[in-house]
Amino acid sequence: MNKMVTIDPTHAATAEMTVNARVATDGAPLTQHPQSLLDLPPGEARQSLLAVHGILGSKLPPTSLAIYEAGGGSTSYLPLDVLRRAHVTVVDIDEDQIRTNDYAQETILGDVQTYRFPLGTFDLVICYNVIEHLADVEAALVGFCESLKQGGLILIGAPNPRSLSGVVTKHSPHWFHVWFYRYVRGEKTAGQPGHPPFPTFFHPLVTLSNLESFAKTHGLQTIYRKQYESPRYPEMRARKPVLAALIDTLARVVNSMLPGKTDVRHGDYHVILRKR
C-alpha cells in the first residue's frame, strides 16, 4: 500500500505524499504530487498527468469540491491540492478495492454502470484505468454526465485499444496479462484478489475518437486530450532491456507501414471533458 499522511487536520481526506523534496519536471516540489505520479517513470505519461493536474487546478472552483471517483482502490491520481479540499466518493464493485481505499470520505460497494447519484452532485468525476474493464461503458458515461454540475469536469485515463499494447491485450487471454504483470513488471501480487490486471472488455467507446463523439452529443466539451507512450515501455527498458529492444523494433516496423506520425507505442490517453 502507498504511504499516506493526513493533509488537513480539519478534513478527513488523506493523500499520498513523499518526504523527498526533489523537484518535478514542472518545477513544483514533488511533495505536491501524489505517489501515483511519482511512481511513473520519466516520460510522456508523467508529463501528461502533470498537464492534467495543471488543468484541474485552474478549471475547478477554488472552494471545497465534491468528487466522484468511479472505481477506486488504494491509489489516487488527483493532485494533492485538489484532494485537500475535496469530499471524495468512491464507487467500486470490488470489495477488496474498497477495503484498501484510505483517501475517500465515502466508499460505496456498487457498479459504476448502474449506480446513480442525484443530478448535478459533483464538480469532478474521475474514471482512471476503469472504462476498459466495463461491459457497458455508455451506461457508465451517462451516469457520470447526469451526476456532474454545470461546468463540471470528467477526467478519464484509459488504454488506447488501437495501440500495440491495446491490440495484444484485447486478443490475448487473461492468464497472459497476469504473467506479464508478474514477470515483466515484477508485480508478484498480480492476479490476486483486489490486484490488477483485471479482465478487459474494450467496449467501442474506449476508443478515443468514439468517446469524443459521445461526449459531443451529450453536451460535453473536450478541453484536453493526449495520447502518449505507455509507461510500460520505459519500465521494460529498465527491467527487461532485451525484450524492450525487440518490442521497440517491432513498433518501429509497424509505424513505418502506418500513415502520418502514428506511433503504436501510444498505448494510453488522458481526456478531460467539461459539461456545458
Regions found by a protein language model. Give the residues of each.
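Helix-to-beta-strand junctions that scaffold the AdoMet/dcAdoMet cofactor pocket
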Residues: 134-135, 148-150
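A short beta-strand submotif of the Rossmann-like class I SAM-dependent methyltransferase core
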Residues: 124-130
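Conserved SAM-binding loop
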Residues: 90, 133, 156
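Conserved N-terminal segment of class I S-adenosyl-L-methionine
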Residues: 2-120, 124, 227, 264-270
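S-adenosyl-L-methionine-dependent methyltransferase catalytic module, highlighting the catalytic core
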Residues: 138-139, 143, 153-274
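Short glycine-/acidic-enriched loop or helix-start segments at secondary-structure transitions
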Residues: 78-80, 100, 136-137, 165-167
